[in-house]
Amino acid sequence: MGAIDMFNDFVKLIESESLPVEAVAIADGDAIIAERHFVPDQDRNIYSHTKSYVSTAIGIAIEDGLLSLDSRLVDSFPEYVPSDAQLELGQITLRHLLTMSSGYNHAYLMNPDRRSGVGAPDYLRYMFSRRVEVEPGSTFCYSSADSDLAGRMLEQAAGMRLGEYLYGTFFSKLDQGWPVWECDPQGHPIAGGGIYMSLANMLKLGQVYLNDGTWHGTRIVSESWVKQASGKQIDTPYSNIWTCGYGYQFWMSPYEGAYRADGAYGQITTVLPKQGLVVAIQCPESGDFDNIVRPALHEHLLLPLTA
């Protein structure tokens, strides 16, 4: 059975079981080969899937000499460093932020907290006042604040906002428009989540990575960055098969060589390098993605594709 047949079987399951899915598609390195929408196609909030775009922007910035993985957070924002700053604060690097190992060891600035006003009005000042609990680089702790700090380091180095930088270096080259992006109280795009994207454009990110950093022959991001960002950089505490390691703002997936950009409620792009395929799905906030859709996606599409 081919990939399209497997896809069609999964679509039939969605319909017969009334699974809470908005859209699903498969692409190879060149084009979408199968796609199905259950609601009108539109840009939607893809939550933490955003983090993988920020990783890509940072990879481009590193290639351009604006940053390095060893760039220190405090060097980007010396004016925010408290007079009684911990030694550990000065040890936090871009690498630590990208691997969710800053040492804060707490899930700061996650979506519910942001929406309730935590950290406002100045996320940088808020995070610089938090205690670094463990040695940077020693412990994985998933936190949108780490992504936000990495994004602000890029903005500082590039001299522009994240949306502007990503448009010039990434989106415009993929024939995408200016990104709609939720911002913090000071107008900075939230690197931890909040970009709005169509299913087809989510797939494009995966296709660039599937093609080792190119889009229809044009180099977008270095092959070296693709391999680093999509490879396991740090172990993650095991809670289920989906927590099997983390790269630079990409999750590892439980299939050979596979990884994913993963946003809340089921906004996910999975890259399957061995099969030369990318699978993307969008789901509603009202659905139980983790307990209903994710197991079905695994058992009825991703496992058959990778068998």
PLM regions with names:
Residues L66-Y104, S129, A157-G193, M197:
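Active-site helix/loop module of the DD-peptidase/beta-lactamase fold
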Residues D30, N45-D70, L97, A150-L154, ...:
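Active-site SXXK
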Residues F7-P40, L69, T269-T270, G276-A280:
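A short, well-structured edge-of-sheet supersecondary motif
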Residues S18, D28, G263-A307:
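Structured C-terminal helix/loop/strand segments within mature extracytoplasmic catalytic/sensor domains
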Residues L149-M153, G193-T214, Q267-Q282:
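Active-site-proximal alpha-helical segments within enzyme catalytic domains
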Residues K227-V279:
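Active-site Gly/Thr loop motif
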Residues Y47, F140-Y142:
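Catalytic tyrosine of NAD(P)H-dependent dehydrogenase/reductases that use a Tyr as the general acid/base
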Residues A31-I32, N111-P136, M160-P179:
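Short, charged, amphipathic alpha-helices and their helix-cap/turn boundaries
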